[in-house]
Amino acid sequence: MTVTPIDPGARIGHVHLKVADLDRALAFYCGVLGFQLMQRRGPQAAFISAGGYHHHIGLNTWESRGGPPPAPGTTGLYHLAVVYPTRAALADALRRLIAAEIPLEGASDHGVSEALYLRDPDDNGVELYWDRPRQEWPRGADGELAMFTRPLDLPALLAERELPARQAAELEG
């Protein structure tokens, strides 16, 4: 069977999550992670974004208001992943989690990326990560991608800071 690949310009536009409590979900996604509320439809739905896009995440209580999370061992969403543009931006996200006392379930270096894993208030898995530049991705002797999973050095990540614009401009020459 010959399969025609998807257009390389295609991407995931958004994820829509069922939540038990819309205000609690907004407090986490907007208050802790820093997403912007783009539109709220009363107590039942909200659309949030990074960078002014119409929405990256939809949140709704249409079928889930007051409900429990899915039972372990059932099918469904494993996690949603939020990509940050720089390592320093991921470090800022980690600082937000620490300040909000949100526990991590894991923190991994995958060679191609560095990632933090946690749960939202509705027990949905959330990954926060940044991608290393492609030229730094690990490759095997055959040239194939050689991802791995190692513990992420959180103190080193927390030491990461965005350079002030003036300082960055001086370094660029």
Each language-model region and where it sits:
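Short secondary-structure junctions
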Residues: 34-40, 104-107
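Conserved beta-strand-loop-alpha-helix junction that forms the acyl-donor binding cleft
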Residues: 19-21, 52, 110-112
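Conserved short beta-strand elements that form part of the metal-binding/catalytic scaffold
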Residues: 36-74, 125-132
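Hydrophobic, helix-prone linear segments
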Residues: 3-16, 30, 41, 47
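Amphipathic alpha-helical segments
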Residues: 21-36, 96
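Short Gly/charged-rich anion-binding patches and loops
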Residues: 24-25, 43, 92
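Vicinal oxygen chelate
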Residues: 1-6, 11-20, 68-173
